[in-house]
Amino acid sequence: MAGNGSAPDTATHQVRQFDQARAEAAVRELLFAIGEDPDRHGLAETPARVARAYREMFAGLYTDPDSVLNTMFDEEHDELVLVKEIPLYSTCEHHLVSFHGVAHVGYIPGNDGRVTGLSKIARLVDLYAKRPQVQERLTSQIADALVKKLNPRGVIVVVEAEHLCMAMRGVRKPGAVTTTSAVRGLFKTNAASRAEALDLILRK
């Protein structure tokens, strides 16, 4: 579910550790709470499976974002670099169900012309998506991490996603898409640059 939320950090992050045993115990208790028998056939291995799945789904909590953007190239490039349609899967922190969609990430390199690898941008999206999230914060975290590491003249991030907490419960509106954006630097101060980037992002 999209909504306001705060986190301990944006572009900075203290790496945590996953507690497999504690996660398994929590899932077992949840099964008891909904009236199920966690020892019956079909559920006996569920706590371990769910814990392993959560470890993968929340892997972004256990990775330092600075380690992702660790490859730079001196290309003396001074125009927009844009990676579109990056698939993302994240988890709404309000209901712990999925939201999924795509991210479009663009930046104009700084005066030194340094760029990062295109795959690094996709990895950065994946890292921040693999946390308990709200879409607005996810969008800003991606933008702020690029600003911190690349010192670019401008950054623009647009995320489009469908939230299962709106589709399968509550208002039950499957197919509704939420769009969020974060702009930094030149894209925030220069309307023409922002419009050009958005045109490229929205062009199919």
UniProtKB/Swiss-Prot annotation:
Pfam family, one: GTP_cyclohydroI
Family, similarity comment: Belongs to the GTP cyclohydrolase I family.
Reaction(s) catalysed (UniProt annotation): GTP + H2O = 7,8-dihydroneopterin 3'-triphosphate + formate + H(+)
Protein name: GTP cyclohydrolase 1
InterPro entries for this protein: GTP-CH-I_C/QueF, GTP-CH-I_N, GTP_CycHdrlase_I, GTP_CycHdrlase_I_CS, GTP_CycHdrlase_I_dom
Domain of life: Bacteria
PANTHER family: GTP CYCLOHYDROLASE 1, GTP CYCLOHYDROLASE I
Species assigned in the record: Mycolicibacterium paratuberculosis (strain ATCC BAA-968 / K-10) (Mycobacterium paratuberculosis)
Gene assigned in the entry: folE
Binding partners and assembly: Homomer.
GO molecular function: GTP binding; GTP cyclohydrolase I activity; zinc ion binding
Taxon lineage: Bacteria, Bacillati, Actinomycetota, Actinomycetes, Mycobacteriales
GO aspect biological process, one term: tetrahydrobiopterin biosynthetic process
